[in-house]
Amino acid sequence: MTTQRSHICLNCQHPLRLDFTQRRPDSADSEKKSETVITEALTGHSRNLMKLISDAQFPSDAPVCNDCSDALRNEMDAQVATLDDEIKTYQTYINYLKENHPTTSIPDLKAKLQNVSDEEKELEQQLKKLLAEEEQLDLDLQTKRRTAEAASEKSGELWKKYRDNLRQVFEDQDELHSLEAERQYAEVQHRKLTDTNVLDLCFHIWVDGIVGEINGFRLGYLKDAPVEFTEINAALGQIVLLLEILLERIGVQHHELMPVAMGSHSYIKLRRNGIDMETYALYGQGTPLSGSSGIDPGIRRFLQLLEFLLKELKDRNKNFKPPYQIHADSLVDNGVKYNAVMTLNTDVRWTRAMALMLTDLKAACAQCDALRSPI
């Protein structure tokens, strides 16, 4: 009786019915072992179907259906054809090597291979060395980058400081230019003040025709242009004050006479041995040139002080020459003497004498200003 068992195709898993009558009789252990091998092959990691088929002695050892058998056979034929092509290729290359390198021997190739191997080892050592150097360079590069970042940060701070300092410099330069402009302006004004005769500003002396003036007060008297004694007294007070300032300016003092400026009641004081001996009034009342004014002694003493001042100025500057010479109680113009006292004098000549006296005072002012030390 024929025994049949149910199996499945190892490839497509379709059920198969195998006739085991054609199988080689084995022991039960052998049959059990064969089934175990098939099961392990089917459930194993590789499931090497070709190996099972190749190792099978009977169809029942590796059951495969006809379709899968044909497919496997065709695949094996394709692999065999591929292997044949590879064999031909290798054979062709072997023939090429034999033809083109007939003298190449195995020892030479081994030696060459050894050299290549040694060179490879040397290159590997060089590569390790280069890798170590590269690692060190990476460390150095990181260090330098950190240093560069710190330097860049410091450079940024320094740039900010430079910017702030530069802005401060520009502001200081602007302020310096402003101060320099102010200094130049002050220097110009100072030069103007230095070149300005303060006495000329404070005591404006002007001679218009015959009648002379000082600070707007007329010092003269004409019948066709009468001047009150109040104005003449004010003018005399101005010239006494000016004479006092000029004597103080050059640092001299008459040994006996001293001008005392008291406005419209000025006078000349006579001192001997430190004692006030007498005063000479330079103010009058009534009608000028009437003979009763009483200012002639004061005018004489004033002319003495003026002559003393002009002499001191000439001693300090030999080139200085007063416009008009003083002789006793007169002033000389082109050899003509003009008496400065009112008694027995005409209005024109006395007025002319006062104008000449004012001109000498104006010249004394200019000379005192020229003698002062530069500031």
Curated annotation (Swiss-Prot):
One Gene Ontology cellular component: dendrite
GO molecular function terms listed in the Swiss-Prot or TrEMBL record: phosphatidylinositol 3-kinase binding; protein-macromolecule adaptor activity
Keywords associated with the record: Autophagy, Cell projection, Coiled coil, Cytoplasm, Endocytosis, Endosome
Tissue specificity comment: Expressed in PVM touch receptor neurons, the ventral nerve cord and in the nerve ring.
Annotated knockout phenotype: Embryonic lethal with few surviving larvae which fail to carry out the L3/L4 molt and few surviving adults which are sterile. At the L3 larval stage, accumulates vacuoles in intestine, hypodermis, pharynx and coelomocytes. Abnormal accumulation of mig-14, lmp-1, and rab-7 on these vacuoles. Mislocalization of several components of the retromer complex, including rme-8, snx-1 and vps-35. Impaired fluid phase endocytosis in coelomocytes. Double knockout with either sorf-1 or sorf-2 results in smaller endosomes and an irregular distribution pattern of PtdIns3P in the cytoplasm.
GO annotation (BP), single: protein catabolic process
Stored Gene3D superfamilies: 6.10.250.3110, Autophagy protein 6/Beclin 1
InterPro entries named in the record: Atg6/Beclin (IPR007243), Atg6/Beclin_C_sf (IPR038274), Atg6/beclin_CC (IPR041691), Atg6_BARA (IPR040455)
Coiled coil region boundaries: 71-147
UniProt-annotated location(s): Cytoplasm; Perikaryon; Cell projection, Dendrite; Cell projection, Axon
Domain of life, per lineage: Eukaryota
Disulfide partners: none
Quaternary structure (record): Interacts with ced-9. Interacts with vps-34. Interacts with sorf-1 and sorf-2.
Protein's job: Regulates autophagy. Together with phosphatidyl-3-phosphate kinase vps-34, acts as a core subunit of the PI3K complex that mediates formation of phosphatidylinositol 3-phosphate (PtdIns3P), thereby regulating membrane trafficking. In association with sorf-1 and sorf-2, negatively regulates phosphatidylinositol 3-phosphate in early endosomes to allow for the conversion to late endosomes. Involved in the clearance of engulfed apoptotic cell corpses. Together with ced-9, negatively regulates somatic and germline apoptosis. Plays a role in endosome-to-Golgi retrograde transport of mig-14.
Family: Belongs to the beclin family.
Protein name stated in the entry: Beclin homolog
